[in-house]
A protein has these predicted regions:
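Internal maturation/activation junctions in enzymes
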Residues: 17-43, 47, 51, 63-123, ...
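A ubiquitous short alpha-helical element
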Residues: 6-11, 42-48, 146-147
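Structural helix-adjacent loops and short alpha-helical linkers that scaffold large soluble proteins
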Residues: 6-15, 67-74, 156, 173
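A general alpha-helix detector
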Residues: 58-62, 78, 160-164
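Catalytic alpha/beta core of large soluble enzyme barrels
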Residues: 23-34, 118-269
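Catalytic-loop motifs flanking and including active-site residues across diverse enzymes
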Residues: 51-58, 125, 157
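Internal glycine-rich alpha/beta core junctions
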Residues: 1-23, 55
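Extended, hydrophobic alpha-helical segments in both membrane/secreted and soluble proteins
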Residues: 55-58, 90-94, 241
């Protein structure tokens, strides 16, 4: 589900349609793999569990679109509201499918069609295809970056930042050059207010603990795991890194994915 467009689909049956579609894809997989020896295990699992994994992208884009800082109470409100809705509507759709097509073996008597309905994937390619929206639940790594595509390398600008700079009359080559020299950051731009700078913080400028806290908040609505990356400064002591992992575990986060950083030499440049 594209959270950047949440306000456009929140009052529709989009989540229900997505679950219906995923369940139909699973049925096609079961049908087409009948008699395939090498996929017997996968087919049997699909038949017994009918596990789905509806995910999201565009989380950070929604926040920036609405000028909400990632590290804010408003962000946590949206986080809870969006994922609670997706969970409730996913479960409702699975119940409807069970009434129509029946329950799989492992869910007999539970009134559900699918053992799981949600999983948060990385979506790097999908987010690029869908208008350069932010990947999954992850913040943008930069407000100005080079995208390597099949036909060459192209510079990409944060569209919501570009709109803001245009309103302030500073959407020009020199401004973007300074953003590039500051590794995609806008914290040096004196024309922006503190609130605006907070909205356009990059991944490395957002507290890893805030990433973990919001992941823990939404985990209660997600029956599977989240593709959750952390951006940790190379200068952070090992004990502090360890503390982040322990806190994630204590807060109920099921998994952590990449621990991103940069070399000390690059950070000193």
């Amino acid at each position: 589900m594209n959270l950047e467009l949440y306000d456009e689909w929140k009052d529709t049956n989009a989540v229900k349609l997505a679950i219906y579609f995923l369940d139909a894809v699973l049925s096609e997989f079961i049908e087409k793999t009948e008699g395939n020896y090498y996929l017997t295990g996968a087919r049997n699992f699909a038949m017994r569990h009918r596990a789905l994994g509806l995910g999201v992208l565009g989380y950070h884009s929604y926040l920036q679109k609405n000028m909400i800082p990632f590290e804010s109470f408003e962000a946590t409100q949206f986080n809870a509201r969006a994922f609670r809705q997706i969970k409730e509507q996913s479960l409702q759709a699975s119940q409807e499918l069970a009434n129509i097509y029946g329950e799989p073996e492992i869910l007999k008597g539970y009134g559900m069609r699918n053992t799981t309905t949600m999983a948060i994937a990385p979506t790097t390619s999908s987010s690029a295809i869908l208008g350069q929206t932010s990947p999954g639940i992850e913040p943008f790594a930069s407000n100005y970056y080079k995208a390597g595509l099949a036909k060459g390398n192209f510079m990409r600008k944060n569209k919501y930042l570009a709109k803001l700079l245009q309103e302030k009359g500073i959407d020009n080559e020199e401004t973007w050059r300074t953003i590039m020299l500051n590794h995609g950051s806008v914290q040096h731009l004196t024309e922006l207010t503190d609130e605006e700078k907070a909205v356009f913080k990059t991944f490395r400028e957002i507290s890893p603990m805030e990433i973990i806290s919001q992941a823990a908040q939404r985990q209660q609505y997600i029956d599977q795991a989240q593709s959750l990356n952390l951006q940790i400064p190379s200068t952070m002591p090992v004990k502090d890194v360890n503390y982040l992992y322990i806190e994630a575990w204590k807060k109920g986060v099921k998994t952590l994915y990449y621990q991103r950083s940069s070399s000390v030499s690059k950070e000193l440049m």
